[in-house]
Amino acid sequence: MKAKGLVSSTAVFPVYLGLEAEEEEEYKSYREVLRETALKVAKNFGVRISGDDASQFAASVPTWPPFSDTPGSLKELGRRGYKRVILSNVDKDILKQTIYQSGLIVDGYITAEDVGSYKPSEGHWKKFFAEYSVSKENTFHVAQSIKHDIIPSSRLRIENAWINRYSESMPTGVDPSYVFRDLKGLLTILS
C-alpha cells in the first residue's frame, strides 16, 4: 500500500481504525477484515488499489514488529512468575507467526478466530476464564486499545493498565486502573 501512497500517518490511521471497527461488526476472518478495510481506506483517500494489493496488505501483518519494549517486558513478566496470555483480534495463524517471528515468549493466546467474535465483545474473556481457570481478582489486563480492551475489561471489573503510547487524551467515562506510556512503566508496579 506504500507504493500506492498510503502509509501509516496521522491522517490515514484514524480512518483505518474507524473502518476496521465497521468491518469487525460481524465475525469473518481477520484477513478478510483487513482486506476490506484496506480497500475502503484507499477509496476514502481517492486512491485505487486492487484486491491483490489489499490481500498483500493483510498478508503483511505477521511481519509487523512489536513495540520495542514488548519482547523484553514479556520475558521479565514471565521471570517474575506472571502468566502472559494474549487476547487478540487476529486469526490464530497470524498470531502464531507474529509470536514466532518476533521471538515473543507467552504462555497462551486466545484469538477472534477461537471465539468467533472481536473485542470489545466478551468472548475472549469468557474463554480466558474458562480455559485458564483463573478468577477476575487474579487477572490483570494490559492493553493499548481503549475501545477493544480497557472499556470491556473495566466493565468486567478486571484490573487493567492502559498503555498510552501516543499520549492520547483520556476519553470521558473511561477509568483504567493504571496508565503508562509503555510496558516499562508497568514493570515498576508489578513485583
Each predicted region: which residue ranges?
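N-terminal helical cap/lid subdomain that shapes the substrate entry/recognition surface
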Residues: 1-71, 79, 93
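Asp-based, Mg2+/Mn2+-dependent phosphohydrolase catalytic module
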Residues: 39, 48-49, 58, 71, ...
